Amino acid sequence: MNSIPISQMLFDIYNAVSELEDSTWNYHYPEYGDFYVYNDLDNILNIELTIDIDYDWECRYITFNMLNNQLDIDEDIPNDQLLDRLRWIYIQLCLK
């Protein structure tokens, strides 16, 4: 899985969520917190994550514009947690 580029994971997640009712996916996973993934009408993938920052669970946001491949990530999301969460979402939505 490490060889899949992040942009490809995001495209695949976007496509998987597009096929769901209301283009929305919610999940609570005790180890990883809460996930809320949805697509909007402007071809943007939105991901809300619960991240452990300084031993406190906080909500952080990721947006990916499908038209221009622009990725916006809240600054303080630790890279290891970000990649971990994206991989986990990818597995749940795209590899089942």
Regions found by a protein language model. Give the residues of each.
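Ampiphathic alpha-helical segments that act as solvent-exposed interaction surfaces
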Residues: I6-M9, I13-V17, L67-K96
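Acidic-histidine catalytic/liganding microenvironments
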Residues: L20
